[in-house]
Structure formats: structure tokens, C-alpha cells
């Protein structure tokens, strides 16, 4: 089954907690802190795979979790990093943030990958918090939470040539004649319900051809699921309009105008692509008597054309020569851009601009907006007196207390920092943690 859209949830691994431990060695009566750091949580990575052609798997499994980092251990042993989770998708998959609609990545090359959720950093062990005045720290950091988000996946086929036409124009028969594809073929409209891909092998060039399900008037408004299909030709280099010469209801010229109109209304850029008109089914008597009239119209149209019979194989080589010619020209005219295999860095972490801390009022609560301070608060057990003392010194050094004063926070008012609620003490110009 061909599925080209999916929604999934991804959760990166949490970082492991730092360890509180002390040296317990013979002949070392006063061993210092020896708590190891927690391991980093695994990232969630999406990777393009040219051997896949559908998003069907994501309709059966929607939730994906990377491994968490191990906790630190005594003797300064660092916890093991969590294993990254690699999710494979077909090449041509676009990844969107489901909440914001932001395009995260467009995976157009085999092996191309992007980090969609980053694992949390491991917490620091108590070794990091030893000072001349705090020689035996009884606290460590908890690991950071891994990122989590919902994603929309959308597949747009990567093909060099797109076959477009009204229902029952003979596109599937043509695809089966020129490529290795084996689409369903039947003498009635809408046999093709999903796009089919085929590979055409010529003497010194290989290119892909996509058979797009039949379009009807109103396709750009998703009539006959046209909107679902039209996006699959957005990436093609060349369009071949397959037109039934024997159709007595919709003459070739009218069929061509319908197709042009639907493509234009969906995206005017589609008509900027090179076009070839393939007049099909010329072996049928109904078509034979109309050929002079059709040829007269085509000469005035000024678009390359060829009369074919996909069923009987008539003039298929001529059509392939035209396809090859335009594919070559288009590929030569498009500058070669080296595609980054890694769209975002994986291990080093992202580069973030330094944010300016601020204190804002929301109803009866003040809230500190400062990622660094919020992150540190969430990593520490602030009900531990030593940890709270360390945090209090940190917010003074970072200028958070001065910021609170400038915001005119009154004595006894509550301030939220990370997951904790504090009360401001104006007399001591400090924060007191609430139970």
C-alpha cells in the first residue's frame, strides 16, 4: 500500500543522573568526591533510504523513543551514553514540526539524515561541585530531559519524468512498456489509485518515470484526490502529457487544456517545466480518422509531440528519445549542489544565541525566562541545602537577583524558575524555596 503522509511522535533519551559518591579506599581516610557524570541521552535521527517507497510503516507504529543515558557511578565512572534511534524514511520525505508547521528537513539524497529530537545531557557528578569551602558535596545534577515533539512526514516522489493525463489515458500501460514497473492495468478509469515509479535504462543514462493517477477537472481542489497526486510531480524535471486520441467524450485538445489548467491552478511553476505531448492509442480506428486534425492543432501548439500506441509499442522509441533529450538538458542546466549528509549536527549540539534573561508577570506569579538558569534549577534537587546554596550563589553571579529588583518584585511574591516556585525575601534580597 502506498502511503505518503504520516504523523509520528519522537522522544529523545533523557540524560543519566550524576552520581554522589566518595572515595572509599584503604589508607585514604578522608577520600574526596568521586561521583561520575551521567551519560547523554540518545538522539532521534531520521535518515533517507532509497530502498523505501512508502510511509506505510508509520501508520502501524507512531511513537518512537531513543535510549536514555546511564547514571554516573562511583570512582568517577561516567554513565554510558544512550544509543541513537535512527528512523528510516523514503528519499523525497519532507519533515515538518506538527505544532508550528515549520519545515525541519527535506531529505532528497540517500543517506541524508537530520536530528529531530536531541538527547538530554548527562548530569554532572558531585566531583564537579567540590571547592575549598565545600570539600564534600552531597549533591549532583540530574540528567536533562530529552526533546520530544510530534512530526508530520510528507513524501514527494523523486522522479525525472512525470506522466500526467486524464483517467484511462494509458499512462500505466506506457510506464510498463518503457520501464521495469508493473502497475495494475485495466480498461476502466481510475485503475491507478497511487503513484507508480519505474526506471528507464538507456545506453548511457538511467532515469525514473512517475505515473501519476488520472486527473479530473477540479483536481487542484482535491477532486478525485487530485491534490494528493499533483504534489508528486513538483520535483520532476520533465512532464509528459499522455492524451487519449480515441476519447470521444473529451477530445485531445480539450483534455490538454484541462490538464494545463489544473497544473497551473495547483502551482504555476509546474507549467514552467519542459513538456512533451504523447498522443496515445493511435492504433484504434476512432483515433486514426482524427490524426490529421490533431496534428494540425499540435503544430500550432508549439510543444514537442509524438503519436504513440503504448499497447502496441508504436513510436515508443521516439518518445524515449524525447524524454532522454529533455532529462539530459534539464540535468545539465541545474547546478550541481553538494547535499549535506548531516542536515544538523548530531553530537556537538546546536549553536544557540545567548538569550537575555527577563522576569515577567503572569497573574499572581512572576516567571523567570532564562534557559540556562531554568535548566540548572531542574537538574538540581533544590531541597538539598548544599544544592540550594550552590544555586543561590549562581543566580547572584548571573545577575538574576538584580533582574528581580529591577522588575520591582515585592516582598513575599512568588517567582517560578524551571519547575520550582520560590518566595522573594526583600529583607535578605534572596529567594526562599517553597515546599
Swiss-Prot record:
Taxonomy, superkingdom: Bacteria
GO biological process assignments: ribosome biogenesis
Domain Obg intervals: 1-158
Enzyme class: hydrolase
Similarity comment text for this entry: Belongs to the TRAFAC class OBG-HflX-like GTPase superfamily. OBG GTPase family.
PANTHER family: DEVELOPMENTALLY REGULATED GTP-BINDING PROTEIN-RELATED, MITOCHONDRIAL RIBOSOME-ASSOCIATED GTPASE 2
Record-given protein name: GTPase Obg
Amino acid at each position: 500500500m502506498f502511503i505518503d503522509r504520516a504523523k509520528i511522535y519522537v522522544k529523545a533519551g533523557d540524560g543519566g543522573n550524576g552520581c554522589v559518591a566518595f572515595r572509599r579506599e584503604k589508607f585514604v581516610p578522608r577520600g574526596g568526591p568521586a561521583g561520575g557524570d551521567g551519560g547523554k541521552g540518545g538522539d532521534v535521527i531520521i535518515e533517507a533510504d532509497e530502498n523505501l517507497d512508502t510511509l506505510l510503516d508509520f501508520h502501524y507504529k507512531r511513537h518512537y523513543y531513543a535510549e536514555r543515558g546511564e547514571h554516573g557511578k562511583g570512582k568517577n565512572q561516567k554513565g554510558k551514553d544512550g544509543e541513537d534511534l535512527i528512523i528510516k524514511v523514503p528519499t523525497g520525505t519532507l519533515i515538518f514540526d506538527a505544532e508550528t508547521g515549520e519545515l525541519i528537513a527535506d531529505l532528497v539524497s540517500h543517506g541524508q539524515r537530520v536530528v529531530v529530537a536531541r538527547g538530554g545531557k548527562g548530569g554532572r557528578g558531585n566531583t564537579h561541585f567540590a571547592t575549598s569551602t565545600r570539600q564534600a558535596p552531597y549533591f549532583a545534577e540530574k540528567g536533562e530531559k530529552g526533546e520530544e515533539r510530534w512530526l508530520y512526514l510528507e513524501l514527494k516522489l523523486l522522479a525525472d519524468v512525470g506522466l500526467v493525463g486524464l483517467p484511462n489515458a494509458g499512462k500505466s500501460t506506457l510506464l510498463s512498456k518503457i520501464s521495469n514497473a508493473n502497475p495494475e492495468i485495466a480498461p476502466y478509469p481510475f485503475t491507478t489509485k497511487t503513484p507508480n515509479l519505474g526506471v528507464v535504462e538507456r545506453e548511457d543514462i538511467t532515469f525514473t518515470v512517475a505515473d501519476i493517477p488520472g486527473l479530473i477537472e477540479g483536481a487542484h481542489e482535491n477532486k478525485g484526490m487530485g491534490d494528493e497526486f499533483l504534489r508528486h510531480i513538483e520535483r520532476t524535471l520533465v512532464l509528459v502529457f499522455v492524451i487519449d486520441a480515441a476519447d470521444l467524450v473529451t477530445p485531445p485538445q480539450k483534455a490538454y487544456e484541462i490538464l494545463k489548467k489544473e497544473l497551473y491552478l495547483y502551482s504555476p511553476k509546474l507549467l514552467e517545466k519542459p513538456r512533451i505531448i504523447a498522443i496515445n492509442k493511435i492504433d484504434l480506428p476512432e483515433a486514426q480518422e482524427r490524426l490529421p486534425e490533431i496534428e494540425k492543432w499540435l503544430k500550432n501548439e508549439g510543444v514537442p509531440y509524438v503519436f504513440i500506441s503504448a499497447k502496441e509499442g508504436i513510436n515508443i522509441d521516439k518518445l524515449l528519445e524525447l524524454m532522454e533529450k529533455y532529462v539530459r538538458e534539464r540535468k545539465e542546466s541545474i547546478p550541481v549542489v553538494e547535499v549535506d549528509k548531516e542536515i544538523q549536527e548530531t553530537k556537538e549540539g546546536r549553536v544557540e544565541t545567548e538569550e537575555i534573561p527577563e522576569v515577567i508577570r503572569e497573574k499572581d506569579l512572576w516567571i523567570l525566562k532564562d534557559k540556562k538558569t531554568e535548566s540548572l534549577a531542574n537538574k538540581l534537587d533544590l531541597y538539598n541545602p548544599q544544592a540550594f546554596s550552590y544555586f543561590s550563589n549562581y543566580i547572584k553571579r548571573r545577575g538574576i537577583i538584580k533582574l528581580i529588583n529591577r522588575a520591582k518584585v515585592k516582598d513575599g511574591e512568588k517567582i517560578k524558575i524551571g519547575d520550582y516556585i520560590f518566595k522573594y525575601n526583600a529583607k535578605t534580597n534572596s529567594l526562599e524555596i517553597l515546599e
